[in-house]
């Protein structure tokens, strides 16, 4: 998927939200006729849409930011962390200073370069979008969660 402009990002977001609204409206209309069953189904469907929308919208945003190729020094640190995720994981596992130095050099060199942010397998709700996972997803794309917290 390629999302290169704000208009393309807005179009894909609008499309994502529109079909979800349509489906939820249909369930809401059914609730009046078959209250208990439809209400239980509606709650399950609402949760599924909430989880799916958050994952997909975060992914679309990540694809968009990735396509801009903005230097890492102009992005929030989370984008460099995503890029160096595997290297960072190996940093702690190895006892070799040469390998650790190589990782640090990679980090320092990339800081001023145009970004090459991976987008696949970054956003996941682990089939359970709770507040902790929501915060992780928002952090992955560099957005604050303050206004969602009590």
Language-model-detected regions and their locations in the chain:
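Helix-loop junctions and short alpha-helical segments
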Residues: 46, 58-150
């Amino acid at each position: 998927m390629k999302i290169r402009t704000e208009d393309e990002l807005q179009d894909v977001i609008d499309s994502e939200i529109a079909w979800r609204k349509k489906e939820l409206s249909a369930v809401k209309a059914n609730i009046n006729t078959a209250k208990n069953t439809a209400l239980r189904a509606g709650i399950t469907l609402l949760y599924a849409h909430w989880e799916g929308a958050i994952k997909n919208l975060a992914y679309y945003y990540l694809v968009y930011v990735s396509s801009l190729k903005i230097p890492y020094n102009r992005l929030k640190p989370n984008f460099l962390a995503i890029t160096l995720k595997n290297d960072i994981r190996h940093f702690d596992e190895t006892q070799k200073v040469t390998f650790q130095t190589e990782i640090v050099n990679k980090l320092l060199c990339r800081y001023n370069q145009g970004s090459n942010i991976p987008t696949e397998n970054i956003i996941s709700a682990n089939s359970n979008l709770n507040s902790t996972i929501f915060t992780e997803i928002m952090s992955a794309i560099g957005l604050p969660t303050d206004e969602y917290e009590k």
